[in-house]
Amino acid sequence: MRRALGTLGCCLALLLPLLPAARGVPHRHRRQPLGSGLGRHGAADTACKNRPLDLVFIIDSSRSVRPEEFEKVKIFLSKMIDTLDVGERTTRVAVMNYASTVKVEFPLRTYFDKASMKEAVSRIQPLSAGTMTGLAIQAAMDEVFTEEMGTRPANFNIPKVVIIVTDGRPQDQVENVAANARTAGIEIYAVGVGRADMQSLRIMASEPLDEHVFYVETYGVIEKLTSKFRETFCAANTCALGTHDCEQVCVSNDGSYLCDCYEGYTLNPDKRTCSAVDVCAPGRHECDQICVSNNGSYVCECFEGYTLNPDKKTCSAMDVCAPGRHDCAQVCRRNGGSYSCDCFEGFTLNPDKKTCSAVDVCAPGRHDCEQVCVRDDLFYTCDCYQGYVLNPDKKTCSRATTSSLVTDEEACKCEAIAALQDSVTSRLEALSTKLDEVSQKLQAYQDRQQVV
């Protein structure tokens, strides 16, 4: 894909001398020489700014790349990041690391500032072993260039770009995989270092090859390529020049521009003006139950009796009677998504519907005893008045009969008493007879004395 240059100053920046330590691809595919005046863009910077990209670096860390050389690659990545207009609405960057396996160091959605990206790059470790370049390109399509991983939708018209850095020959099939990637709209730049196979680089890269294939002799000068890529990604910045008609946000796009809106607004059909959106309108949010608008964005909440799940979208019914979730003094009874309080047996719920008080179990209406209620702590037993006995149901009473009041033991006692009483009576009668006889004899004696 041929790149339009923004201004005359930007064009002049391309025509710099060739570095002694680096050479271009073979003559029939030669690019403009790599410049020695790197980083000197002067006034061109004000009107020449890299256009928004979804940019993925795929770096070879196979066994042929020595540790000190891999550190040079990381320096190259950091310098590339410094030249980019990084941000959520501008250029997004991902880094993949490959050898015999592929590792996504960070996808497009992870970092939107240069400092965080460069810190993540500094922590990358080589994988060693083989050079599975085709596997890495396929992984970029399957695992990185997806909306879930931060790639912007097709209607945003943001270019998808891959920069592959390798020093060897691929050990797997790359031609078909690279062709599929290009067909999917991915622009591929191939950077060869040292022993890199030039034919493989040309097979991978997009057309025209003289704009998409780069070669340097050593990793020691790879960072010099940052200038070439900056020039490649440079576009006339209509947004910076202020010659656009966007109401809110202007986004540079491959020499042109697109209009966008602030968060909480949506672009109108005229593609220039914006209208505020109801982020909680049906179909605009992912909340399971309640959507709460929050400064152009939204947060999800749940109905009473439900709790928000870790995904911050869906809700689950909570156990409202779990410890710490209710204020019942004794018993919590779940009632749908709410609860009510109750009390243990022997207690009654107070008017506050939370606390409990002990009840008089023998108070009228609280027991089923027919005659006498006897309180026993929180419980009671029934009893009867004198002359009544408790029935087997332990509640009602029946009048006691005489026979039922005398036990066998008491009957024996009665017989013994009766016998004793008979014996005493008999003796008293005998004694009385004796006393009568003595009294008669005494009277007769007294009579005789009077006669004398």
Curated annotation (Swiss-Prot):
<comment type="function">
    <text>Major component of the extracellular matrix of cartilage and may play a role in the formation of extracellular filamentous networks.</text>
</comment>
<feature type="disulfide bond">
    <location>
        <begin position="239"/>
        <end position="250"/>
    </location>
</feature>
<keyword id="KW-0677">Repeat</keyword>
<dbReference type="InterPro" id="IPR036465">
    <property type="entry name" value="vWFA_dom_sf"/>
</dbReference>
<dbReference type="GO" id="GO:0005576">
    <property type="term" value="C:extracellular region"/>
</dbReference>
<keyword id="KW-0175">Coiled coil</keyword>
<keyword id="KW-0732">Signal</keyword>
<feature type="disulfide bond">
    <location>
        <begin position="280"/>
        <end position="291"/>
    </location>
</feature>
<feature type="disulfide bond">
    <location>
        <begin position="328"/>
        <end position="341"/>
    </location>
</feature>
<dbReference type="InterPro" id="IPR026823">
    <property type="entry name" value="cEGF"/>
</dbReference>
<feature type="domain" description="VWFA">
    <location>
        <begin position="54"/>
        <end position="229"/>
    </location>
</feature>
<feature type="domain" description="EGF-like 4">
    <location>
        <begin position="358"/>
        <end position="398"/>
    </location>
</feature>
<feature type="disulfide bond">
    <location>
        <begin position="362"/>
        <end position="373"/>
    </location>
</feature>
<feature type="glycosylation site" description="N-linked (GlcNAc...) asparagine">
    <location>
        <position position="295"/>
    </location>
</feature>
<feature type="signal peptide">
    <location>
        <begin position="1"/>
        <end position="24"/>
    </location>
</feature>
<dbReference type="InterPro" id="IPR009030">
    <property type="entry name" value="Growth_fac_rcpt_cys_sf"/>
</dbReference>
<dbReference type="InterPro" id="IPR019466">
    <property type="entry name" value="Matrilin_coiled-coil_trimer"/>
</dbReference>
<dbReference type="Pfam" id="PF00092">
    <property type="entry name" value="VWA"/>
</dbReference>
<dbReference type="Pfam" id="PF10393">
    <property type="entry name" value="Matrilin_ccoil"/>
</dbReference>
<dbReference type="GO" id="GO:0062023">
    <property type="term" value="C:collagen-containing extracellular matrix"/>
</dbReference>
<keyword id="KW-0325">Glycoprotein</keyword>
<comment type="subunit">
    <text>Can form homooligomers (monomers, dimers, trimers and tetramers) and heterooligomers with matrilin-1.</text>
</comment>
<feature type="disulfide bond">
    <location>
        <begin position="302"/>
        <end position="315"/>
    </location>
</feature>
<feature type="domain" description="EGF-like 1">
    <location>
        <begin position="235"/>
        <end position="275"/>
    </location>
</feature>
<feature type="disulfide bond">
    <location>
        <begin position="369"/>
        <end position="382"/>
    </location>
</feature>
<dbReference type="InterPro" id="IPR036337">
    <property type="entry name" value="Matrilin_cc_sf"/>
</dbReference>
<protein>
    <recommendedName>
        <fullName>Matrilin-3</fullName>
    </recommendedName>
</protein>
<feature type="disulfide bond">
    <location>
        <begin position="261"/>
        <end position="274"/>
    </location>
</feature>
<feature type="disulfide bond">
    <location>
        <begin position="287"/>
        <end position="300"/>
    </location>
</feature>
<dbReference type="InterPro" id="IPR000742">
    <property type="entry name" value="EGF-like_dom"/>
</dbReference>
<keyword id="KW-0245">EGF-like domain</keyword>
<dbReference type="InterPro" id="IPR001881">
    <property type="entry name" value="EGF-like_Ca-bd_dom"/>
</dbReference>
<dbReference type="Pfam" id="PF12662">
    <property type="entry name" value="cEGF"/>
</dbReference>
<feature type="domain" description="EGF-like 2">
    <location>
        <begin position="276"/>
        <end position="316"/>
    </location>
</feature>
<dbReference type="InterPro" id="IPR050525">
    <property type="entry name" value="ECM_Assembly_Org"/>
</dbReference>
<feature type="disulfide bond">
    <location>
        <begin position="343"/>
        <end position="356"/>
    </location>
</feature>
<dbReference type="GO" id="GO:0005509">
    <property type="term" value="F:calcium ion binding"/>
</dbReference>
<feature type="disulfide bond">
    <location>
        <begin position="246"/>
        <end position="259"/>
    </location>
</feature>
<feature type="disulfide bond">
    <location>
        <begin position="321"/>
        <end position="332"/>
    </location>
</feature>
<feature type="domain" description="EGF-like 3">
    <location>
        <begin position="317"/>
        <end position="357"/>
    </location>
</feature>
<feature type="coiled-coil region">
    <location>
        <begin position="419"/>
        <end position="451"/>
    </location>
</feature>
<keyword id="KW-0964">Secreted</keyword>
